[in-house]
Amino acid sequence: PPPLAGIRVVDLTHHLGGPLATMYLAQLGADVVKVEPPEGDGWRHVDSVRGESRVFHAVNRGKRGIVLDLATPEGREALGRLVDRADVMVHSFTPGVAERLGAGPEEALARNPRLVHCSLSAFGPEARRGTD
């Protein structure tokens, strides 16, 4: 079996770094569930051919998908149920967003103490853009 067979990953990433990281987990056999907002991941609309984005499909191959409206209590509770059963959760929200959605490390680990919580913020935990 693949090295990560049996590992469940909740993917709350966007842009490229996070989706690439979770794509590699899927390629190694993890069961990755990509969570998208009702309007779809932003990459679905980039570089599209006949309405299908090559970029989106390239970095999300091997994943299952679910649409959740995390702006609603129902969407956040559905996310919580995914977290309950997950081994890993990866997000690429700007600082503070995961906490507002109930997906920050304290909330997620309270639901699932064995969870590996991974944050891939583009500009670090304090959201300062690089200046070098």
Residue ranges of predicted features:
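N-terminal helix-loop segment corresponding to the beta1-alpha1 unit
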Residues: 1-132
